[in-house]
Amino acid sequence: MCRLGLFSILILINQAGKAGWGQFDIYQPLAKNNVKIDPMNHETIKIACANCNMRELCMPIGLSQDELNRIDEMIGSRRKVKRGETLFHNGEKFTNLYAIRTGFFKTCIASEDGRDQVTGFQMAGEIIGMDGIVNDHHTCDAVALEDAEICAMPFAEIETLSREVNALQHHVHKIMSREIVREHGVMLLLGSMRAEERLAAFLLNLAQRLHSRGFSQSELILRMTREEIGSYLGLKLETISRTFSRFVEDGIVAVKQRHVHILNTQALQDIVNPK
């Protein structure tokens, strides 16, 4: 499931976005990715996780101290990923799920003509890498759109522990269900919406996801290019630019380079769901 996160089924995604995965990493770096590793001992990681501002998003509610300690025992290190670097590649063996602590990623696949087809955008507090569960290999590339930091946990250990900790098992099921909902949302978006509806849905979804993490829901800094947005939405660059210009002319948004100020949220909602 490389396609993640369009306005859907929109409220469901927003609610589910508050659940995520945690601050764990015992994965060894892939040399070909040139990803910088932040070596940390067990006690240091425990402190880092306890103080992490993603803890409420990542950890299942209701775990006992003993259960938390068992999760802590799987921790090894965190990873820093520089802008433009790849976290995992299409075809690479699947071993981990990744929680994004900071930064922004895109997932993409190479189309037949050699261009990258963007299949999703992921931000801090969200999970990346679930595409590999199906056949034990990743089906897309994950590329950092800005300097980022991630935590990883071996999926085999997640499965083992979730069989013993009911709250963790429920959390796993909830995350997988969310990805199915998101996949359906993208299919709906690309199959039936006009250009204006697609871009409006994209902006609303991005605003909702940021707001659920304590950021402004009207002031957006787009980490992706317009070309990448167009690739994700199935629209040409010229169409994206024209649609943004139309939104500006109608007083719906103000745009300055990658900064987007949503002036009229209701107007965007009316575009997606006309009365």
Describe the residue ranges of each PLM region:
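Short hydrophobic targeting helices and cationic amphipathic motifs
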Residues: S8, L12-Q15, Q28
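Phosphate-/nucleic-acid-contacting segments
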Residues: Q23, P29-N34, Q208-K275
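Cyclic nucleotide-binding regulatory module and flanking cytosolic helices
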Residues: N34-R83, I127-I128, G132-I133
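Glycine- and acidic-residue-biased ligand/ion/polar-headgroup-sensing regions
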Residues: G84, T95-C108, A124-G125
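Short phosphate-coordinating micro-motif centered on Lys-Gly-acidic
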Residues: T86-E92
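Cyclic-nucleotide recognition modules
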Residues: V118-V181, G185
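Polybasic "coupling" helices that flank or enter modular domains
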Residues: R163-K236
